[in-house]
Amino acid sequence: IVPQGQVPAVVQPTEVPEAVLPGAEEYIEIGRGAAGEAFTVDWLRSNGFIIVERNWRYEHYEVDIIATRRGVMHFVEVKTRALGSIESAFEAINTTKRTALLHAMRAYTRRTRWASDVQVDLAAVEACLDGSFIMHYTPGIMGGDAGD
């Protein structure tokens, strides 16, 4: 968690908690990316997060999920990959994506007048052939100054 007003920084993932949801056939019907987001919403709710927004857009920026927990606003980027995919979800969060997330985060916190802590989290979802998903959730991949 980075308090408002500090300079953003990239953080390498340390320990990654995992979750597996077997029998997720209802997710498969909507496509891999949307299924990964739906699975992530369910996972977040089951872990005490309150979902505030889904697919929130500002200009040409988008945040997959905005949620709160324990007084912290979480901007969750969801990356869904087939099990064993060559590019990792963490590698997909390049400089351009980090900049876009930062702009969207700042815009959202200005609009909502959110004055508490914010953080960007990564939900790396692996889609298995049997219809199950594996969640690798990395909190705080990037700090953020949401104020201006």
PLM segments and residue spans:
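Mid-chain, well-packed structural core segment of small domains
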Residues: 86-116
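Conserved catalytic cores of phosphodiester-cleaving nucleases, focusing on short active-site segments
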Residues: 44, 63-86, 95, 101
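Short, glycine/acidic-enriched loop or turn micro-motifs at the edges of active sites
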Residues: 56-58, 80
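Structural motif
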Residues: 60, 73-75, 117, 135
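Short acidic/glycine-enriched loop/turn segments that link adjacent beta-strands
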Residues: 58-61, 131
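Hydrophobic residues on conserved beta-strands that form the core of alpha/beta folds
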Residues: 51-53, 75, 120
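Domain-level recognition of nuclease-like catalytic cores that cleave nucleotide substrates
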Residues: 1, 5, 111-148
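Acidic-basic catalytic patches of nuclease active cores, encompassing PD-(D/E)XK
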Residues: 2-54
